[in-house]
Amino acid sequence: MDNNEKTYELAFNIIVHAGESRSLSSEAMDAAEAYDFEKAEDLLKQANDEFLKCHEIQTDMLTKEANGEKNDLNVILIHSQDHLTMATMAMDNAKRWIKINKKLQKMEER
């Protein structure tokens, strides 16, 4: 496998895991809205696990680049970084949404 093919493979792996992370974060928000906080926290943990897979790929690429091994820069790799950013934002939003819904539930119980 040449370097360009390897870069595509890594980029697509980032896209897959980032997409799964984002989807799980969305499910966590739905669970929080239903006040199922145990499920929401579990889904958020799964989202983080998927995110860490992306981060590991990215860190490996950065380490290799720092050690002089060049990665081919292509649109798919750039696109994968967009997905990684969206996954990060989705997890951050899910964490906030869980907190907000916990407060809302307490207010409704009064």
Where are these regions (language model features)?
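Terminal alpha-helical segments
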Residues: 1-110
